[in-house]
Amino acid sequence: MAQILPIRFQEHLQLQNLGINPANIGFSTLTMESDKFICIREKVGEQAQVVIIDMNDPSNPIRRPISADSAIMNPASKVIALKAGKTLQIFNIEMKSKMKAHTMTDDVTFWKWISLNTVALVTDNAVYHWSMEGESQPVKMFDRHSSLAGCQIINYRTDAKQKWLLLTGISAQQNRVVGAMQLYSVDRKVSQPIEGHAASFAQFKMEGNAEESTLFCFAVRGQAGGKLHIIEVGTPPTGNQPFPKKAVDVFFPPEAQNDFPVAMQISEKHDVVFLITKYGYIHLYDLETGTCIYMNRISGETIFVTAPHEATAGIIGVNRKGQVLSVCVEEENIIPYITNVLQNPDLALRMAVRNNLAGAEELFARKFNALFAQGNYSEAAKVAANAPKGILRTPDTIRRFQSVPAQPGQTSPLLQYFGILLDQGQLNKYESLELCRPVLQQGRKQLLEKWLKEDKLECSEELGDLVKSVDPTLALSVYLRANVPNKVIQCFAETGQVQKIVLYAKKVGYTPDWIFLLRNVMRISPDQGQQFAQMLVQDEEPLADITQIVDVFMEYNLIQQCTAFLLDALKNNRPSEGPLQTRLLEMNLMHAPQVADAILGNQMFTHYDRAHIAQLCEKAGLLQRALEHFTDLYDIKRAVVHTHLLNPEWLVNYFGSLSVEDSLECLRAMLSANIRQNLQICVQVASKYHEQLSTQSLIELFESFKSFEGLFYFLGSIVNFSQDPDVHFKYIQAACKTGQIKEVERICRESNCYDPERVKNFLKEAKLTDQLPLIIVCDRFDFVHDLVLYLYRNNLQKYIEIYVQKVNPSRLPVVIGGLLDVDCSEDVIKNLILVVRGQFSTDELVAEVEKRNRLKLLLPWLEARIHEGCEEPATHNALAKIYIDSNNNPERFLRENPYYDSRVVGKYCEKRDPHLACVAYERGQCDLELINVCNENSLFKSLSRYLVRRKDPELWGSVLLESNPYRRPLIDQVVQTALSETQDPEEVSVTVKAFMTADLPNELIELLEKIVLDNSVFSEHRNLQNLLILTAIKADRTRVMEYINRLDNYDAPDIANIAISNELFEEAFAIFRKFDVNTSAVQVLIEHIGNLDRAYEFAERCNEPAVWSQLAKAQLQKGMVKEAIDSYIKADDPSSYMEVVQAANASGNWEELVKYLQMARKKARESYVETELIFALAKTNRLAELEEFINGPNNAHIQQVGDRCYDEKMYDAAKLLYNNVSNFGRLASTLVHLGEYQAAVDGARKANSTRTWKEVCFACVDGKEFRLAQMCGLHIVVHADELEELINYYQDRGYFEELITMLEAALGLERAHMGMFTELAILYSKFKPQKMREHLELFWSRVNIPKVLRAAEQAHLWAELVFLYDKYEEYDNAIITMMNHPTDAWKEGQFKDIITKVANVELYYKAIQFYLEFKPLLLNDLLMVLSPRLDHTRAVNYFSKVKQLPLVKPYLRSVQNHNNKSVNESLNNLFITEEDYQALRTSIDAYDNFDNISLAQRLEKHELIEFRRIAAYLFKGNNRWKQSVELCKKDSLYKDAMQYASESKDTELAEELLQWFLQEEKRECFGACLFTCYDLLRPDVVLETAWRHNIMDFAMPYFIQVMKEYLTKVDKLDASESLRKEEEQATETQPIVYGQPQLMLTAGPSVAVPPQAPFGYGYTAPPYGQPQPGFGYSM
């Protein structure tokens, strides 16, 4: 059976499996501030990244592109601190925001989160704390001690309150790593240097101390060895005993001489110190005693970072392989381990008590029983109370303490036991009952309350029942804590806390009998019953049936309470609650009608029986409520006529709920019953509902009762809003009949809805005394003529004067017209006009009189108004008309009068005298009217003069429209008459613009020729000359040349450009030539006429440089390069040298180009010119001139020219140029092309450029100059990027030997790199495999192993392949290769060395199979090597299958110590086969893991007796005693048979063996069996058997021994019984605990307790002196 371990070891993840580069797993790049996150800085390609691994989701690492020197994650949240140089930043990753930043003055060499919001910063000189909250800067805590100078800082720790700070560093001194620490006290501000490697702080509460102590633990590996120190820092808190210092040795194995502590964490849960060393060892120490609990190696690699593992209260760390490992205390095993393995029961007890750990149950039980048996009840009580997991807190323990009587003057052991339990915490259920029973019997209820408040008792239903008889409220508290719903609710009801019942029931999910509860509550208090009932129905789903609840109310005749309950319960007005609503109203209508009225008034309910309630309301005198509920018309009419009993406002609203027919019937009934009383209410109803009842029906209703008063008031209420003409008419009628004349006037004046004709006729027939309503109607609706006739014929002339004077004076013209129609006297009319003068429209008056041809009637009145200074146009218009008709000098009036309306008077004159109409229209600038008159009467001369004088472009545009049929005669008059007469330039300008705007070019030319060519005032006008030429260009191009030659005062450049745009190139050329603009002239010839010959002739004629330049440019564009260059030379113009050079390059005119560039160089020393001149000289092969030129002063780009010459293969010229600028790289390339290899190599050496070396090298290879090629190649191969191309170049041409020679020569170079060694290895594999092994053995560390692996595999170099796999740590592939190619690759030592390192264990079994097939004699050696990781069961099964077990017997013997079943059985089978019974017996005794029964059954049939003996031994070992004894008897193994029978403890088997001995007459054996099986045999049976077989002599020694033992037992029993009687007599005189008058637990300080003996195993119990407070002492 495997040994139990006190720790649990776990690998959480492998960082390399998450894609983390192994090179980045180290102290400088990986941080772990807690067990939540791991943070790694990596570089992927050129990008720096930070990888954050959340330990709760490790398979999804977070990668962020962050370039920082260091990154540490917050211990709890996704907040990261970054350091880059001296800049510190804190970021919140989830919020994607920067929280804080700071720039330090010194470099931070180490930093660490010391809490959730504080970072510690360590510089070369000091330590700072930086809070991430607020805006605070880092705060300096202390300066670094000189002892840490030059140390690498590896950790920084603080205690829980950050009062003690510790900085840890290491340094190399005297071939060992020395640890240095600086301990700093914040309160004292002092430091202490300490030698140490790892340390931590812990809070530990010693037994007997009230406060925790701050402990400082540190480990050191000095020259003398390792030590762990545990000390208390600072002054112990008041009342605390100081913690005794501990210093224990730390064991380091002999093979780990250089090992030292690197990390320490302390488990607060278990008070265990975890110490980790550099070599991967873990040590566990007890914090209190310093005892080493366990030590083992957990990692082959250094664990360089650790943190507390919160989930297990252990330690978690990362090693250099990337394993994330954790170690914690195995709670189930640590106590048994300390007890059994360490043999330290004291420590086991201590830890079990202190940390509540299981595993020490037997120790505690043994100690308790021992103390109890000794009578040390006080210590026994402490042991029982302190035992972990409450293993001794059982009813049996309480009964044992109850059975012990209390000593006089002392507290009983039971109460001592309870006192200790109360000190420690809560009592369990049984303990609480047993303690409370005597407390309540003594009336100490307050003690119980105190314990409940302190949560010292475990509440139960039984405890509640016990308390209830004393205090129901306290019992309620107990039931609540015990969660006994039925008892809780019962107590709530009994104590009147009904409001809590429903809430509690819902909370715990309990459903009691609510109706039963309600009856009980109602019996006690109706008000509380009502409250409880309301709580039952307050939810959407009532807890009880509401009908049953109402029945309970009615049982106690609680109408008021029931009403209040139902009002609340039925407030949601559900359809299903209709019967309950009816019941509520019914009970109140019978007993409290006013309450019912209020309920109905609130309209809370709608689902009750309305008919039944209506009848009850009528009986109760609630007519209004009855009407609300009646649906039958008969019932409604019966009630509604009693209006004196009803609220009028309500009754009006009530009618809104009736149908139209029912409403009219009720109104009719009300009017019939008492019209005087009910008329007003009927009018109100009619007014409000007239739209629904229809106004017509209501009018007919009132008319049927001849109630014009009702009709007037009804219609008066709606007439202001009604649009019905009949309503307005009926209202006017009713008002007339009731004498309301003022209302008639108002409605006639304001209403727009009545029929005016109908009202007019009614008012005429009504013969009212006041005609004002009629006047209003006629005035509003234009019945003035009828009104005048009616009033004039009825001799009511005074109303006519009233009308025009007071009502509407503006109607005077119509009235005058009417009076003229009835032949009224002119004097009357004139007087009427004079009376109302100025308040009417003169135009209308004139129109009315004019229609009747009586205009002269107004002449005196008009002249009088003008005399008065009237400027009204209408007056003057009328006067003008009279003068025109009477021909009273009208033209003078029209020209001089400024007030008349020209348009009106002109219109009046059109048919009478067109000339007068023109005068009137011209005076008023009535353009359109004047044009129409002139056109109709052919007055074009007048019109043309008017238009010229008017100067209106829009007016011109209207008459010059093509659609105007009078345009031509008008234009003729304008040209011949109007413009000839004018001297105003503006009039001419407007006219010309008008012709231009109208697009009349021919007419415009005609007009302009008249003006310009006929020697008028405007002949030399520049704009008119321009306009004439431009118009000709547009309209008649044949005249353009004539105008150009005749006219001189025009804008020549502008006109010429316009001519060009209209393609009149010859005209343009003539203009330029006339005005000597030669450059423009030649431009026209070149660009527009396109005749270069004419241009050349023109250039020769004028011989101007600018003209030659333009001609040259044109010739260049046409490709006439030679001619163009000649022209440029004549122009002496080098400005276009770039275009000339490009054209000459394209056409190859190099000789001409040389001439041009030489001319250009004289003008301008441009770099471009000189550069192109050099290239032109090279192209013309003038190398001597070229060399002379470049050796002289110049600005040319010689390098650029050299490159061009090189590109065009002019190598001689290029050679001169490159040599001139010392470009040895290109010079070397040029020399290569010239075949001068040696000179090319020299040039390449001077250039020292990789590209040049490559070019020269490749050229030398092509020229088979391998010596020179190697010289070049040695400069190339040192560049890894160029190596592949060079190798391919050699290989493609088959020069393998030369390539290998070059690479071999290159290996000794200073800059030799991995690629060279790799490629040479690959070449060896292909072309010289015999050299590859030697090369690899020398340089395997400098080759790219994966590439060489592929090459070796392709070349079938299996030995070399294995060698590489081994060096590359691909051990699996190495083994596979050796097994696949044993002839070439297998070597025994190498195979056994590599096989132990493989990752895939399956290869072990393939290796076994391989050895079995090829090297069977070496198989055991292999198995010995494989055994640590081999599955022995599988291996044995395999060898059994292939029947080779004997071959591997040495292996099986070597691994049998694992006690493997398959191994054991296989070896046992081999021993049986070899008949080696001694080896078989040894194997069986040493290793028990095999099928015992099967082996025994097999051996019992074996031919050799020793094997059958082993079978009996096996049967015995498996409790098959009978088979074992029978087998011994069969083989006469008497001694074995007796021994096995004795060991069986089976009396029957022993007696059967005795009988068998007698049957076989083996009397000596009989005698021996009596003593061997002495304890099993019954004396009477032995006596009978011996007597019957007459062998008493053989049995006599047995009987003597039996008699001796029995007599001794009887003597002891007698003495014991006597002692017991004496004790009973002494006990009867002492009282029992419950008979005491006072509870011993509350006896107070007067009870003295003697000092107790200490616990066993070195455990010291806490001193028990004064009683502890909190148990009810000092009552």
UniProtKB/Swiss-Prot annotation:
Chain positions with Phosphoserine modification: 67, 1167, 1229, 1494
List the residue ranges of the region (Distal segment).
Answer: 524-634
Residues that the record marks as modified (N6-succinyllysine) are 737, 1441
Q: Which UniProt keywords apply?
A: Acetylation, Autophagy, Cell cycle, Cell division, Coated pit, Cytoplasm, Cytoplasmic vesicle, Cytoskeleton, Membrane, Mitosis, Phosphoprotein, Repeat
Q: Which GO molecular-function terms appear in the entry?
A: clathrin light chain binding; double-stranded RNA binding; protein kinase binding; structural molecule activity
Residue ranges of the region described as WD40-like repeat 6:
258-301
Locate the region Flexible linker. Answer: 480-523
Subcellular localization, per the record?
Cytoplasmic vesicle membrane; Membrane, Coated pit; Melanosome; Cytoplasm, Cytoskeleton, Spindle
Q: Where is this region: Binding site for the uncoating ATPase, involved in lattice disassembly?
A: 449-465
Repeat positions for CHCR:
537-683, 686-828, 833-972, 979-1124, 1128-1269, 1274-1420, 1423-1566
| Region described as WD40-like repeat 2 | 68-107
UniProt family annotation: Belongs to the clathrin heavy chain family.
Report the protein name in the record: Clathrin heavy chain 1
Per the UniProt record, the source organism is: Mus musculus (Mouse)
